[in-house]
């Protein structure tokens, strides 16, 4: 969608920003604008903010690891464009119409499935961060404690966390590895196919979503048990005057989140797009 706005004079100080809000007044995305005098044109790809996805290695040939790079597509409806130029704010309406190439598409049903997958990607992102944080903490405390029994308990906990972590996200770039469930790639793949297609998902896809949601819930339950094991070790850690375990909460995770990157420091969208076509 092209958004045009007029500036009487060139903006010499400060930034120009366009914010897209939905009908509930919620901010969907913020886009940097241009500062030229006269008519300015900014393109919005009609996508919202990407999900806060799980981290892991960038696996060659696997599109699911790019889930944190693509936001959900906005649905047809009325939106508000808020133009901010220095201390001045201007608002105008923006109407997104239905795609004439996809007549009869049930946008409401499609959006429900999209939001479900988005939520699954973010839930997994938080879970992976929590497991990784506690695993790393357990390893550090095991190296620092004097009590041999406590050290053994910490090492066992770290090993359990490591095993769970390996089922949640990719840890090895080699192909053909068997016996490992990697929810990050599997959930991410369904999310990306949903967001890069103009069609409703097939029954096999919705069945797969239900299965992966169940697997995610099982992983969350398993992690919850390990979190309790970690908490039970806190009194012993306190006796040794070491910092105790603290579970990473959602607010802290979201505040400190930065999008995962590949080895080059950025996503290779060209390869990702080839995999999705």
Show where each model-derived region lies:
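Active-site-proximal structural scaffolding
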Residues: 11, 20, 33-37, 72-76, ...
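Conserved structural position at the C-terminal beta-strand
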Residues: 83-85
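Low-complexity, Pro/Ser/Thr- and charge-rich linker/hinge segments at domain boundaries
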Residues: 91-126
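Contiguous beta-strand segments within globular domains
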Residues: 1-17, 21, 41, 114-121, ...
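Hydrophobic beta-strand positions in extracellular immunoglobulin-like domains
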Residues: 5-7, 46, 96
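Glycine-centered tight-turn motifs at strand-turn-strand junctions
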Residues: 27-72
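Mature extracytoplasmic or organellar-lumen-exposed domains after removal of signal/transit peptides
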Residues: 92-94, 125-277
């Amino acid at each position: 969608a092209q958004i045009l706005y007029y500036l009487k004079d060139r903006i010499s100080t400060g930034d120009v920003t366009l914010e897209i809000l939905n009908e509930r007044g919620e901010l969907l995305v913020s886009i940097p604008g241009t500062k030229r005098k006269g008519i300015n044109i900014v393109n919005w790809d009609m996508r919202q903010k990407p999900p806060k996805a799980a981290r892991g290695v960038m696996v060659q040939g696997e599109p699911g690891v790019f889930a944190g790079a693509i936001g959900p597509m906005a649905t047809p409806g009325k939106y508000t464009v808020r133009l901010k130029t220095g201390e001045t704010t201007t608002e105008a309406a923006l109407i997104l119409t239905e795609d004439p190439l996809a007549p009869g598409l049930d946008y409401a049903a499609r959006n429900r499935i999209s939001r479900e997958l988005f939520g699954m990607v973010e839930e997994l992102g938080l879970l992976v961060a929590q497991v990784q944080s506690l695993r790393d903490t357990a390893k550090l405390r095991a190296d620092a404690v004097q009590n041999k029994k406590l050290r053994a308990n910490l090492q066992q906990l770290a090993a359990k966390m490591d095993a769970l972590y390996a089922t949640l996200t990719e840890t090895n770039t080699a192909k053909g590895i068997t016996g490992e469930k990697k929810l990050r790639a599997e959930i991410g793949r369904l999310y990306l196919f949903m967001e890069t297609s103009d069609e409703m998902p097939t029954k096999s896809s919705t069945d797969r979503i239900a299965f992966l949601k169940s697997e995610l819930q099982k992983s969350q339950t398993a992690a919850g048990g390990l979190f309790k094991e970690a908490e039970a070790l806190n009194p012993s850690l306190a006796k040794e005057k070491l910092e105790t375990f603290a579970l990473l909460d959602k607010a802290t995770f979201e505040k400190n989140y930065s999008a995962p990157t590949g080895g080059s420091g950025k996503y290779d969208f060209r390869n990702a797009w080839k995999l999705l076509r």
